């Protein structure tokens, strides 16, 4: 049963539910400000010790202030519920924003500051307009765990030793042409560059996001990418156990680095690996690892090489392919060291 209120926030409606919490559309009782409130608990969904630690870690996140980072308003524990109140962003998640199907005339994303309105500013020569509908609002479920099922288009379990399964069905020439359109690649570079800026800022403060995936990046009506869902963020110097549920590695398997999948300590390079998974997926149309279940996926992340990107999409931008391949190195020491290096590589 949903709480009627959490802390100073009146619960209005459910945005989405996940394995460790629920996200609500809520209103601050005094200011009237709308927010997305992620609620963890009540016990026994999360241990009391972990809940208190979460509240302390979330409180630190209130200091985050960057144009490509969703604002964290406040956090706390209220009647057994740990909660995190964040800026309510309307728009498209990164995957939807870069969908080839959206390269057509349509309204621009909806601003969190203004209701939907007709038209919307467009710049046909640079970033094509994108459509917004109910799915855009549901994209706020980005703050939740995604199911670990094999994405459509991935191969069955059988594959060559040491190499993850290739797509079950090669993409059509039309699909590949759409993936490689200059306008789409322009906004891909722009969006990922902004994500790199956000990561550089977060990492510079000593944080690791730990759950970077396409649905945790929203693009608003200003074509501004916004990194969101800091429910799993931790200080790189602290132990992972602070926000790990019993018997479970927290995060979304498909985008985890090998070290995170093993429950080892992580640093900024783990987030950069996750960014590499995102880039591979956006270039190939499918993720690098397509395991049909968590166990198979775990094995692929730890031991398999992704199918060569140029074998999946021969027309992919070579410079972007090189960036993705370096980010996906199993050994963190062979990846980019800092998000600023990725921004420079994208600009080059």
Name every feature range the model reports, one short phrase each.
Residues 16, 56, 65-68, 90, ...:
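Flexible N-lobe loop architecture of eukaryotic-like protein kinase catalytic domains
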Residues 22:
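Conserved N-lobe ATP-binding subsite of Hanks-type protein kinase domains
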Residues 27, 70-73, 86-102, 199-200, ...:
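C-terminal lobe helix-coil module of Hanks-type protein kinase domains
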Residues 27-35:
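Conserved N-lobe loop of protein kinases adjacent to the ATP-binding glycine-rich P-loop
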Residues 41-63:
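AlphaC helix of the eukaryotic protein kinase fold
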Residues 45-49, 102-180, 222-258, 262:
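Activation segment of protein kinases
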Residues 208:
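Conserved catalytic-core element of eukaryotic-like protein kinases
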